[in-house]
């Protein structure tokens, strides 16, 4: 609850900062779980890959090319930054729908998951968003974290809030470093 309140309090300043940086383009609505493409035209039963910025997107694209070549199907690649989104769009990987990640506010990740009905979620980062993770768990969507690295600074934070870290990491089904 405190996390969500914090999100709501900081959201206006975040939106203002993004506007100064060039805005969201068409991505702002996607951050609220609203999409231009008709629901019936969206891929279902996808592999949902969450990559925040350019570095994670590059790794995600390599992962997705290998995954889709081996297994087929389709995927959703969700990014959080305009540069990460542009990198993913420019790659034009067949079978991959690129979206902006929903804000981690109650209801928004779930709305996104209900739209794409992911069979699994792969996080390409060492960050776990609480409402996102909870929405996946409630829907029974397995979640994995790949490319997980932890700096000394992050480690000290996780240790300081060990009880909270244990809770958040309990949402993961597997982790790859």
Give the positions of each predicted feature.
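N-terminal, charge-rich interaction modules
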Residues: 1-8
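Active-site and donor-binding regions of nucleotide-sugar-utilizing enzymes
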Residues: 11-177
